[in-house]
Amino acid sequence: MTYPNPLFPGFNPDPSILKDGEDYYLVNSSFEFLPGLPIHQSKDLVNWTLIGHVLTRDSQVTLQGVFTNGGVWAPTIRKHDGLFYVTVKIAGKFGEPAGMHIFTAEHPAGPWSDGIKVLGLEGIDPDLAWDENGDCWMAFSGLNFSTGKPVHHGIQSAKINPNTGEVLSEVIDLWEGAGLMFPEGPHLYRIGEYWYLLAAEGGTDRGHAVTIARGPSPVGPWESAPHNPVLTARSEFHTVQNVGHGDLVQTPDGGWAMVCLGVRTFGVSNGFS
């Protein structure tokens, strides 16, 4: 089965997708805009309807004075025990505290909770996954801002309580990626007998790519796919570039698809990395 692209034209970066029964729900980054984190719904991955936003009020997030590359970005949408979760990085004005937050709702159309901050984890692009024991793991791109100059630590994870934000384990170094720069945007999946770790690498410009690894548990150890990257438009001739930041979902016919971002080329860029 084929699907037309783009799913959404215009400014709809960092997609994350969830299949719930016959319905698909997709959330995007919204950065400094409120209402934020738009939620679209579809039954066929072709026809989509905007059904609401995660962020609709000041009690959830304050965006006044936020820079264009600040605000909220790289959300993940998941469902566990009948409750929908969206986790996302929230960055305030320059110098103000930021963090990874979790919002919940009984339906993706909302209303969504005021949210909680996960205390003690430093990074961006959070993901949520539940293992066979019901434990919740937050994977993220480790990024320490405390020194004034961000220090990157690759893909990391920790066991958390998603309802309180409490961190229940030490931070674990998951994966350094497949060899491109700055692994980020992780997503964990249990498929069959393996766990899979999907990531974005290569920076968010022309070198953007999607890579994958697999292992026996949500904490690895991880075996990088020999054909990484599994998706990229790294070139000087593709009409759509910067392709990456993917999330996997099962299609109506039982196959698999990936949603990702892409940019039509215009002017100069930071090139490859």
What are these regions, as identified by a protein language model?
Residues 1-273:
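Carbohydrate-active catalytic/glycan-binding domains of CAZyme proteins
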